[in-house]
Amino acid sequence: MRTLSLPLALTARISPVVVLAAAGWALTSGPAATPAAQKESAPRAADETPSGASTAAASKAFSTSPAPCGSISAATIKSLVPGAKTAGKEIPSTDTALRRTCSWNALKGYDYRWLDVSFEITESDQAAAKSYKENIAEKSGGGSVPGVGDAGYSVVNLTTEDKQQTREGVVMIQASNALVTVTYNGSDFESKKAPSTDEINKGAIRAAKEAVKALESGQRT
């Protein structure tokens, strides 16, 4: 098998922990977007009011974040990130009661995959809904994810750096006063291509559903 030099995108993605730790709390967005970035996904979803949001002024279902590295099943990790250690790696947070993130990544042959799941616990349903709407307003394209939490949104982007494609999916879910964000991306460093939009989108949504289930099955206030 011929030897291929890996582009800068791989180096940046294999060791993201230091960068995220310095930030304290950040939603990963994959390799830096370039002017060649393309937005792709289902049609844009209309702004939705979370159907299950409480009308109480300061309603709050969750008081702490669940253990993020235990929120995704080993079977799902093996499927989405072949070759990764199923235990994952938790990224340091300034307040683990309110914000926690776990990541998994692996290079198997020339196929690279990255997955992370983040939980943020806000002071109320209303605060979570506001943050959710602000986050999706910053995105372009995308569509709703029905049947998960109170509101859900998914978007898939394609970026190209050093002629290497990377496709990344981001799923954001609001569940009561909690926000769950999943980032899933991949690249093929032999073909220089990226996995299909369908593969990345379905993988991110699969992980998001498991993360929300772990949140909801945990301790409530």
Task: Describe these PLM feature segments.
Residues T3-V17, G24-T221:
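A small/polar (G/S/T-enriched), proline-flanked helix-loop surface module common
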